[in-house]
Amino acid sequence: MGSLGSKNPQTKQAQVLLLGLDSAGKSTLLYKLKLAKDITTIPTIGFNVEMIELERNLSLTVWDVGGQEKMRTVWGCYCENTDGLVYVVDSTDKQRLEESQRQFEHILKNEHIKNVPVVLLANKQDMPGALTAEDITRMFKVKKLCSDRNWYVQPCCALTGEGLAQGFRKLTGFVKSHMKSRGDTLAFFKQN
């Protein structure tokens, strides 16, 4: 499904930030998407970086940053030059939803990701009692917080892979549009 890199010079590179609380399933879904197989992950201390090519002309460099409390303090350092944000929510961990929502709201205030498209992945949909994508949209105030950007909430299951491709395809479309509008803006300023 994914490849390490593209040999096609026409391929554009996009930087994607993959965030969420610890144990939300970020690394599991990244490697499920990239390798299309189950792997055992351990909590990410620091970050993982992988390139995924879902379309011939766009390669995503995905920065999977650890979600432990001490790592969240440095999330902002990874925001510069970001073309897309994927925020992963454990839809079954109702005790930490408020904390996750606060972190989501905090990262959206970072100046470097202003107008950057967002896909929320409502993970662990295979578990009983998982909140729906609609529940997550409402609880995370996505319509209000993301009114200045493209956004989408995708239900998924990192273990089975269900919903991952759809969520990342949506992100890819948003990223292309964002990069084009940013490129048009840069071209305008170079001319004037």
Swiss-Prot record:
Q: Which CDD domains match?
A: ARLTS1 (cd04156)
The protein's matches in Pfam families, at most eight in alphabetical order, are given as: Arf
- Which residues are recorded as binding GTP? 20-27, 64-68, 123-126
Summary of the tissues where the protein is detected = Expressed in immature dendritic cells.
Q: Which InterPro entries match?
A: P-loop_NTPase, Small_GTP-bd, Small_GTPase_ARF, Small_GTPase_ARF/SAR
User: What are the alphabetically sorted keywords of the record?
Assistant: Cytoplasmic vesicle, GTP-binding, Lipoprotein, Myristate, Nucleotide-binding
Any one of the GO BP annotations: intracellular protein transport
GO cellular component assignments: cytoplasm; cytoplasmic vesicle; plasma membrane
Where's it found, cell-wise? Answer: Cytoplasmic vesicle
Query: What's a single GO MF annotation on this record?
Result: GTP binding
Residues annotated as signal peptide: none
Query: Residues with N-myristoyl glycine lipidation?
Result: G2
Purpose of the protein: GTPase that recruits MYO1E to MHC class II-containing vesicles via the effector protein ARL14EP and hence controls the movement of these vesicles along the actin cytoskeleton in dendritic cells.
Assembly with partners or alone: Interacts with ARL14EP.
Q: Which family does it belong to?
A: Belongs to the small GTPase superfamily. Arf family.
Q: What is this protein called?
A: ADP-ribosylation factor-like protein 14
Q: Which organism is it from?
A: Homo sapiens
